[in-house]
Amino acid sequence: MAAGHMHMNNGSAVSGEYKKIVYWICTIAALGGLLFGLDQGFIANSLETIEKVYFLGVEGGEKYAAILATGGIIGALLSGIFARFLGRKRSLILAGFLFSSLSIVSATLPAIAVLSACRFGLGFAVGIASFIVPLYLSETAPASIRGSMGSLFQLMITIGIFLIAVTNVVIARIFLNPHVALPIMFLVIAAFSLIMFIGSFRLPESPRWLMLKGRKAQAREVLARV
């Protein structure tokens, strides 16, 4: 009976650990998609506020808006290298760090050259997330929820675009001073980014990447947990 009781306790511990891992995988999948959408949709209802602060004009505003896509293309192209050499987990941490740090720097309203560099970096992070998050999910998420996680990532992109559009309009109407409104707009992204950045440290590494690196014991340990 004692042995049976111990077995039940071990089973409960394993079940609890499994639920925690699944929770964090779901959270990062959601945040990765959300941040993708937040940064993609940010410019739509913030450009007018940005122009009031930086006096960009139509052409300058268009150039600033396009920088994100440029960074995104380069980030996506280099994501395979990051995934291979850094691993999936550390690549996610890198993306979270870029999202959070560059959003915070942007909120300080730096010179336009620095702001543009931050937007390029945010695009770079979007490119990394767009490649790494689905890859990580395909290799790590439990088979029972793997398909749902891919759908969740796509859904959260759309939600992020909608959310930032509504949020920026509300912020601009509440805070009429653009020098106050614009930092708050950037800090909204920073808040979600910090959750992703910190949460990524708690994720298990991809078992496939561990196997590719010859770390078979660690890979089996991760597979046993998920």
Regions found by a protein language model. Give the residues of each.
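Transmembrane-helix signature of 12-pass secondary carriers
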Residues: 2-225
